[in-house]
Amino acid sequence: MLWLALGPFPAMENQVLVIRIKIPNSGAVDWTVHSGPQLLFRDVLDVIGQVLPEATTTAFEYEDEDGDRITVRSDEEMKAMLSYYYSTVMEQQVNGQLIEPLQIFPRACKPPGERNIHGLKVNTRAGPSQHSSPAVSDSLPSNSLKKSSAELKKILANGQMNEQDIRYRDTLGHGNGGTVYKAYHVPSGKILAVKVILLDITLELQKQIMSELEILYKCDSSYIIGFYGAFFVENRISICTEFMDGGSLDVYRKMPEHVLGRIAVAVVKGLTYLWSLKILHRDVKPSNMLVNTRGQVKLCDFGVSTQLVNSIAKTYVGTNAYMAPERISGEQYGIHSDVWSLGISFMELALGRFPYPQIQKNQGSLMPLQLLQCIVDEDSPVLPVGEFSEPFVHFITQCMRKQPKERPAPEELMGHPFIVQFNDGNAAVVSMWVCRALEERRSQQGPP
């Protein structure tokens, strides 16, 4: 019998939970779960995978009080299901009724012949390696510009990163493009971040995305998040990257300028590096700027794969609030559009709020186009007088010029007095600030 732990609801922390996994046309399997740590969505999928080894399940359903099926695809939806179930259990206990198991229904899976079954990975190269056994390495693939094309083919074809080797732990965040998990890579013993994106695309487009992602192995910058690999399972792409224990900047409060300056230096260096490789980031915003307790700052989620960018845009409808005016208007996009996004991001981090007060970002950065028309029609926002240094005010003002060609070029950004002032390599300033902020957050949350 399989035993796991569960305990997100204090009143039920000693209550044994029985989950009844309904198997189509074959009855059911009962799974006993004891109290303890919070049960994750991935844990349930793992158990369903043991019950239905011939199928790939990406979601499951439960029935509400009206008998309607509710789909669970994330940890948040998992919590909602458990909350609903425990409320019914409490009612059953009060009324002296027999406690019924929590019944879940794995979503109908495609027949094996329609699934991607080659190591749970879409190979971008044909040949014998497609059917070879996955290689097990002592560590995750490192980033190096010296990697040959043959090495890249091997990494993409030998299944070095695949679903079977990953154990999902905590949910780090939900974005408009998918869900990010903290995960454990079994062969290497490394902690990594895995972004899982649901995409309704063909096998050919999956292969194209995997091919386009090859360039990430060439990125060798301390200001760019480390890339370990990617794989498809059904209609989910999982992108495996370096784990940053400080998380993304969007979850932090208003930042002091001496910290903001050193973070800005790292972001500008990261963008300059990408631009030198002819890569536009396309999605510069605080949630794509990551920090760790060592004081490092790194960019993530840049648009190296045009097909992936387009597929996400078709799947997750909306317009990014950090887009430059010309992008919102549907005009040509270039480096200067990244520069606008840089400016509005650091203006938000300095103010502790989004610079356009009429735009509320409570539900993330994607929103209907009409709400963002003010970015196109109105003058650029300005920082309040007297609160910030002249170099910082000038830096933001230049980045947020309405005309793209009036914004600084890459070399002008690096030479700007604000960037020069804080380009001292003092990571300790960022490290102390991140550690203090994380400690304050833990103290506010109280004991686990």
Swiss-Prot record:
Residues 18-109 form the PB1 domain. It holds the Pfam family Pkinase. GO terms for molecular function: ATP binding; MAP kinase kinase activity; metal ion binding; protein kinase activity; protein serine kinase activity; protein serine/threonine kinase activity; protein tyrosine kinase activity. Residues 116-144 are annotated as: Disordered. One of its GO terms (cellular component) is spindle. The modification Phosphoserine is found at residue 311. It comes from the Eukaryota. Residues 166-409 form the Protein kinase domain. Belongs to the protein kinase superfamily. STE Ser/Thr protein kinase family. MAP kinase kinase subfamily. Interacts with PARD6A, MAP3K3 and MAPK7. Forms a complex with SQSTM1 and PRKCZ or PRKCI. This is Dual specificity mitogen-activated protein kinase kinase 5. The gene is MAP2K5.
